[in-house]
Amino acid sequence: VDGMSLYDLNLGEKAIIKYINGDDKLTKRLLALGCIEGTEIELKRIAPLGDPIIVNLRGFDLAIRKKDAKNIFLAV
């Protein structure tokens, strides 16, 4: 596994989704939400304990668990 994950982004930073490294269930759920390769994603907020994080993609905010964010890899 190489590259930076969504969890590594700083607040307000944007990046492009490169690939998702997770089980079928996670991948299908994220794909259904429009979280696909080539989509720009921005880190909007981090919950007080670091979980979940709030991201914005395709114009809407989405809460993603920390463990899932670590499986979404980015091209920066």
Tell what function each PLM region has.
Residues 1-76:
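Compact, glycine-rich, soluble single-domain proteins
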